[in-house]
């Protein structure tokens, strides 16, 4: 079907939001999201632009990282601009976000998987490594997305806001955006904050 659509002149990099894909993702990003490596490879060979990001900063490589598909991530990483995976360049790129040194150090050294089995709703979460942190814009605010995924809930983003130097969260489904905590407070007890987030404790 994809081959037929391209033969008929479809835009391989089409990424306007619609009812099916409201986040303005490209076909190759959606192929990565469904873990379809052969389709990703085929779309790339047909000229897909793997550097285009969707509304939440995702691109094929970051989706492969989220899906823990190392083979796909390695394939896409090799095709991306080299400086996207260069630590000095990443430091330069993220300077405007005024990240605390402790946060940067944590994302470089880990542990990136946070576990709190005694909690009820969310028992674990996984943060991005420093190199994989994603830039995104929400209602004209420039933010950094720090969390790959968390237990039971896929519609929440954990974000760093340079404006007040705090963690915020975004409930994608309900478009709720609220402040959560300073980094030091959050990392001292992430289970409390992530479960409180789900329970609506921080909605102000």
Question: Where does each model-flagged region fall?
Answer:
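Ankyrin repeat domain, specifically the short helix-to-loop turn at the C-terminus of the second helix
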Residues: 3-12, 41-49, 75-81
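Helical anchoring/docking segments at protein termini
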Residues: 85-204
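Ankyrin-repeat boundary/"N-cap" motif
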Residues: 15-29, 53-59
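Eukaryotic tandem repeat interaction scaffolds
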Residues: 1-20, 91-92, 96, 107
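Conserved ankyrin/ankyrin-like repeat signature
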Residues: 1, 38-39, 71-72
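Alpha-helical linker/edge segments of TPR/alpha-solenoid repeat scaffolds
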Residues: 70-74, 84-86
């Amino acid at each position: 079907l994809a081959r037929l659509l391209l033969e008929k002149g479809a835009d391989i990099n089409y990424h306007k939001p619609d009812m099916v894909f409201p986040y303005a993702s490209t076909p190759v990003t959606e192929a990565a999201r469904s873990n379809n490596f052969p389709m990703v490879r085929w779309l790339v060979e047909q000229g897909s632009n793997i550097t285009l990001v969707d509304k939440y900063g995702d691109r094929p490589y970051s989706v492969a990282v989220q899906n823990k598909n190392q083979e796909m991530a390695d394939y896409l990483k090799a095709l991306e601009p080299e400086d996207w995976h260069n630590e000095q360049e990443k430091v330069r790129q993220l300077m405007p976000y005024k990240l605390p040194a402790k946060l940067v150090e944590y994302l470089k050294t880990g542990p990136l998987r946070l576990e709190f089995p005694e909690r009820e709703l969310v028992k674990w979460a996984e943060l991005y490594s420093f190199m994989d942190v994603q830039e995104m814009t929400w209602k004209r605010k420039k933010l950094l997305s720090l969390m790959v995924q968390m237990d039971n809930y896929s519609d929440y983003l954990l974000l760093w806001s340079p404006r007040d130097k705090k963690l915020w969260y975004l409930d994608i489904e309900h478009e709720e955006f609220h402040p959560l905590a300073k980094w030091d407070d959050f990392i001292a007890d992430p289970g409390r904050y992530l479960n409180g987030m789900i329970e609506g404790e921080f909605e102000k």
